[in-house]
A protein has these predicted regions:
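Alpha-helical adaptor scaffolds
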Residues: 46-49, 53-70, 75, 79-80
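Ankyrin-repeat helical core positions
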Residues: 2, 23, 35-36, 56, ...
Length: 165
């Protein structure tokens, strides 16, 4: 409940909050006002999706940045296993992809069908995002056991070859 007594995180029949609907529409000022009033930045709907996911999938860069500033979980997974990073990579949005990575999104996360953000970007032919994610994977694997590092880096090289074919 907000300071004014309004149920700020009340959900509609689909499980969506006002924050989610504002993020979906790219209403950055409304998103910020709701967050300042105490809206839960990481509230989930019935499919496990968050306001950040709605902003990402609809390419609302300024809304994404606002949600990140208010602590949105960049590694949250919806019921299907998808993450905001996978959604950004699948949409071909390098600016949002980079913002998510800069905020700590893990490029190693695998969704239910067994795909990473890198695989999604590769399948859709987004070469610049593939290169960005390959670099992020290399950084993410530093300090891991050599066997894991080799497997992940080998995966990235395989993906790079597939993109160039």
């Amino acid at each position: 409940m907000s300071r004014t007594g309004i149920m700020i995180d009340e959900k509609d029949e689909g499980g969506n909050t006002d924050l989610m609907r504002a993020a979906l529409d790219g209403q950055t000022e409304t998103v910020e006002a709701l967050l300042r009033s105490g809206a839960d930045v990481n509230a989930r709907n019935g499919e496990g999706r968050t306001a950040l996911m709605f902003a990402v999938v609809n390419l609302h860069t300024s809304t994404v940045r606002t949600l990140l500033q208010f602590g949105a979980d960049v590694n949250v997974q919806a019921t299907c296993g998808c993450t905001p990073l996978m959604l950004a990579a699948g949409n071909g949005d390098i600016v949002i992809t980079r913002a998510l990575l800069d905020s700590g999104a893990d490029p190693r996360t695998i969704c239910r069908p067994g795909k990473t953000a890198l695989i999604v970007a590769r399948e859709r032919g987004y070469r610049a995002i593939v290169e960005l994610l390959k670099r992020a994977l290399a950084e993410a694997t530093q300090g891991k056991p050599k066997s894991l590092r080799s497997n992940v880096q080998g995966h990235a090289r395989t993906d790079a070859l597939a993109v160039t074919k």
